[in-house]
Amino acid sequence: MSSEAEAVSSAIQETVTAAPAAVPATKSMSIIVTKGSLDWAYPPFILATTAAAMGLPVTMFFTFYGLPLLLKKLDLKLTAAGNPAMKMPMMGAHMGLPNILTAVPGVDAACSKMMKNLMNKKGVASIEDLRELAIEADVRMIACQMTMDLFEYDLDDMIEGPELGGAATYIECATQADINLFI
């Protein structure tokens, strides 16, 4: 595990230790992961690893655009188009881009690079590290078989650990879970 992942793991453990009450062992969580952009990749992995650190069994179901988060090689990007809440700290203020500028070629690449640099500077773990933490915490990951077929992904393209399953596999899990999230 990288030092970045170890730092995140320690931070999660500290958060869990400081939690006012322990979560009953009978609680569980499921997350449908539908988005695979840089900014949308973080919430499901942060919630999954935190819940797992708190002792909850967690299942993540990766479908449609969330499925590429299970690829061995990630190339995460974000788009500023239509995201008025995306204001980056620059020159002592939080500045956003007018939507018209987001149509300029190269803006998404620049925004992605700026976000990755900011995350690195602030010590935010990479998705690769969070994914590794999830696997180490025994988070159950299900790759949607229909999406694999639809987008012609091969199991060899994916990291080791996730199982293949479909909607019925997820629904079976979700009907038993106390917390169900759609991200």
What are these regions (language model features)?
Residues L70-A80:
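Glycine-rich loop at the start of a catalytic domain that most often binds anionic cofactors/ligands
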Residues V58-F64, I142-C144:
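Short internal beta-strands
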Residues S2-A21:
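Positively charged, low-complexity intrinsically disordered leader regions
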Residues I31-A41, L70-L71, L118-K122:
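Short, glycine-rich nucleotide/cofactor-binding loops
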Residues Y42-G55, M60:
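Histidine-anchored nucleotide/phosphate-binding helix
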Residues F64-P68, M148:
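Short beta-alpha junction loops
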Residues D108-G165, T169:
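A charged, amphipathic interaction segment
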